[in-house]
C-alpha cells in the first residue's frame, strides 16, 4: 500500500520524522540556536554551499556556531519542506547584515538533504553566487561575482574564518 506521496506505507513514518527534522533545523536557525542545529547532523555528515564547498563532521556544527554568533539584523523564513525516507528538501531565505561590508543581504537558497540514522548525513545549499556577491560585496560582486576568481577568494576567506573560529574554540 502507498500513501498520498506514492511511498510505501512503512516509509511514511520515516518521511514524517525527516520532515520534522528539517523543520527543527530551520526553527533552531531562526532562533540562532547553533547547538540545536548541530544536533541535527550525523557525525559523518557532509555539507556544501558556494562559500563552504566541502565541510564534514564537526566542521559543520562549528560553521553554524560561527555564523549564528556573528549574525546581525538576522531573520529567516523557510518553506517547501519535503522529505522521504532517504531524501529531503527545503527553500529558505535569510536576511542579514554582511559584517565585512555593512551591506544587507537577502539570499534565496534551495537545500537538499540525505538522511541516515534519523539525522542529516548530507546537506547541499544552492544559491546564485553572483546575486549574493552583488548584495554582500557591492561593486566588486557586480563586476566579478560571475567569476571563479571571486568565488575562490570568498571560499578561501570563509575557510580561513572557520579555521580561526575553530582554533579559538579548542
Predicted regions and their residues:
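A solvent-exposed, acidic/Ser-Thr-rich amphipathic alpha-helical stretch
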Residues: 34-38, 42-88
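Aromatic side chains
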Residues: 25-29, 41, 47, 52, ...
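Short, low-complexity N-terminal intrinsically disordered segments enriched in polar/charged residues
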Residues: 1-39, 43, 157-170
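Alpha-helix initiation/capping motif
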Residues: 11-15, 53, 102
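A beta-strand edge to alpha-helix "cap/lid" segment located at domain peripheries
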Residues: 2-10, 68-77, 82-170
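Soluble or luminal CAZymes and related metallo-dependent hydrolases
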Residues: 17, 59, 105
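Hydrophobic pocket/interface hotspot
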Residues: 22-25, 37-38, 45, 60, ...
